Amino acid sequence: MKFYPLTFIPILKDRIWGGTKLKTYLNKDIVSQTTGESWEISTVPNDISVVRSGSLIGKNINEVIAMYPEEILGKVVIERFGKQFPLLFKFIDAKEDLSIQLHPNDALAKERHNSFGKTEMWYVMQADEAARLVVGFKNDSNSAAYLDHLQRKKVVDLLEMHPVKKAMFSF
């Protein structure tokens, strides 16, 4: 088969913290005022990306990988992750603060969720003046401090935050 750039139908997700910038900046076909995410490539169960055009139109990414594993994933990825696409590509519009999330490592994710862990990489395409990225808890945080701050509704004080601006990259 002659391969071509595969594009997928975006999977749009409403979030309480979302907005309309996915339409403004990326011309996404959103109708909600709270669209927070556009999943571009996903193998998350119940949200599997479907090819948008070409000879593979209508096939989902898992079907394409089953037909052409090495061509799509490459030998190194197959050796490490099997015939599964190990990434989730998405655009985010965070009009409001996102929820605090804990992402398990690969071992815990496999044990409890039958999936891979979640390491995040961010590239900032646009940022409002006060925009910031939360990169975890401050180094001196501990369980007792967390529980205390949680009770007082001050958990945000324990977070390590960095200002962001357009074209910034964080991993």
Predicted regions and their residues:
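Transition-metal
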Residues: 1-141
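Short, structured beta-strand/loop micro-motifs enriched in basic residues and often containing a Trp
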Residues: 148-156
